[in-house]
């Protein structure tokens, strides 16, 4: 059964959040020289925020797949 538009939108949002978090972590890890005004505390704060976003996105994708993977909608 095809997923509803709301479930598809939730999946797309979680995928976008995951990509954004991975990009931020990659920039902080590999291209930090280009980010001028950051202190060590700023880098850690930004990395922690990106990790939180990544964890949240992965959790959402796992939950959406668990309940709306290849199965019919539960309601």
Model-derived segments and spans:
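Extended, charge-rich alpha-helical interface modules
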Residues: 2-75
